[in-house]
């Protein structure tokens, strides 16, 4: 992984505008790092014009560099269109893990009393997505069938990364699949979670069935949690967890490919929101999630890069705590004004830290 190079994956509409704001935080005069930022235009027009060739080029560059920051993109509905760039990127970099983290934003009232961060670590491949489906007539009735597949290597990647993340953040690994009903299929993930727990004996581990995981989320709100999950379980769970914190503005999404040692080899970060076409060009959209995505990405670099990521993350949350907020969080700051303030605070933090 080349921590001095971040592949920039441009997107659509307000998603692209927010990416540009996040990139301002990565300038040398802000974080003191000379980063290479090769750019690839993954807007819908570019993907159509190149028949997705630009996406394949971006995937190759991402795989070589190891770090990528992606704007939100439009996925057209037609089956004969270019489809989702995320699917191509995921397949070509070998991404097996998706991590989405919900966290409290100062001054924003969460739902149900959740407090500490919750990270959902889900399979990026297999399961219900990509399953083979068909229907057959059965007398006067009709039957539907589906054949799903998950692999032990992917279960191991999800479990191991979940425990690594919990170890790094002081969280508890919580939850699990419905292995009592499906001991062969869903039990595969449970076996790998148990094995990862043995490799990380200092990480608190509380296995739960997936239905109990949903039910117990609010009552376990005092502890930071990491929840490894199957593909569809995690997709649904993250759609619940992120809004529980009152806003998804404090959440980023990471696609991760692991090496043979089960360590991150390639990481692509993006905001956990869409292209917000109605906000395009108005300078009112909240850039926080995109800025935090960039900060999270820096956390996979060397020590100096990690420090820059921490400074950006703290500056972002402290700005909100001091009342500098965009309209969606009840404030009056515009997109550029908020980013300006995060830049000022980030530079100030890094200057102070360098003197300690």
Question: Which role does the model predict for each range below?
Answer:
Residues 5-14, 68-72, 172-179, 295-299, ...:
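Short glycine-rich or small-residue beta-strand-to-loop segments that form or flank ligand, phosphate
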Residues 46-47, 218-323:
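Glycine-rich phosphate/nucleotide-binding loop
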Residues 47-145, 232, 236:
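N-terminal glycine-rich phosphate/adenylate-binding segment common to multiple enzyme folds
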Residues 12-15, 66, 121, 162, ...:
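Buried hydrophobic positions in well-ordered alpha/beta secondary-structure cores of metabolic enzymes
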Residues 7-30, 140-210, 223:
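Glycine-rich phosphate/diphosphate-binding loop of Rossmann-like nucleotide-binding domains
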Residues 131-174, 179-183, 304-356:
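Glycine-rich phosphate/pyrophosphate-binding loop and the adjoining helix
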Residues 41-46, 185-227, 231-239, 271:
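Active-site rim loops that border cofactor/substrate pockets in soluble metabolic enzymes
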Residues 33-56, 217:
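N-terminal beta-loop-helix "entrance" segment that forms/cooperates
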């Amino acid at each position: 992984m080349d921590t001095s190079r971040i592949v920039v994956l441009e997107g659509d509409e307000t998603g692209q505008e927010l990416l540009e704001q996040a990139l301002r935080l990565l300038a040398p005069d802000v974080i003191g790092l000379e980063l290479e930022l090769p750019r690839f235009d993954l807007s819908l027009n570019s993907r159509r014009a190149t028949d997705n060739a630009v996406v394949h080029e971006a995937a190759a560059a991402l795989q070589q560099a190891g770090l990528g920051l992606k704007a939100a993109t439009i996925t057209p509905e037609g089956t004969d269109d270019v489809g989702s760039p995320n699917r191509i990127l995921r397949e070509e970099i070998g991404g097996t893990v998706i991590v989405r983290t919900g966290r409290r934003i100062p001054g924003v009232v969460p739902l149900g009393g959740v407090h500490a961060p919750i990270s959902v670590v889900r399979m990026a491949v297999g399961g219900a997505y990509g399953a083979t489906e068909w229907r057959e007539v059965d007398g006067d009735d009709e039957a539907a069938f589906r054949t799903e597949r998950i692999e032990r290597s992917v279960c191991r990647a999800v479990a191991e990364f979940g425990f690594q993340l919990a170890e790094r953040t002081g969280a508890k690994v919580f939850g699990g699949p419905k292995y009592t009903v499906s001991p062969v299929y869903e039990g595969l993930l449970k076996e790998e979670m148990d094995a990862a727990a043995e490799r990380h004996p200092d990480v608190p581990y509380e296995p739960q069935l997936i239905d109990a995981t949903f039910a117990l989320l609010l009552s376990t709100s005092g502890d930071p949690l990491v929840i490894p999950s199957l593909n569809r379980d995690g997709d649904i769970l993250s759609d619940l967890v992120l809004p529980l914190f009152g806003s998804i503005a404090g959440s980023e999404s990471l696609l991760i490919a692991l090496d043979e040692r089960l360590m991150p080899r390639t990481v692509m970060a993006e905001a956990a929101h869409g292209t917000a076409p109605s906000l395009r060009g108005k300078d009112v959209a909240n850039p926080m999630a995109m800025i935090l995505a960039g900060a999270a990405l820096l956390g996979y670099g060397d020590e100096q890069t990690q420090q820059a990521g921490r400074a950006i993350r703290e500056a972002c949350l402290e700005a909100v705590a001091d009342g500098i907020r965009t309209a969606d969080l009840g404030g009056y700051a515009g997109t550029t004004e908020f980013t300006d303030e995060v830049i000022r605070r980030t530079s100030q933090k890094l200057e102070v830290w360098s003197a300690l």
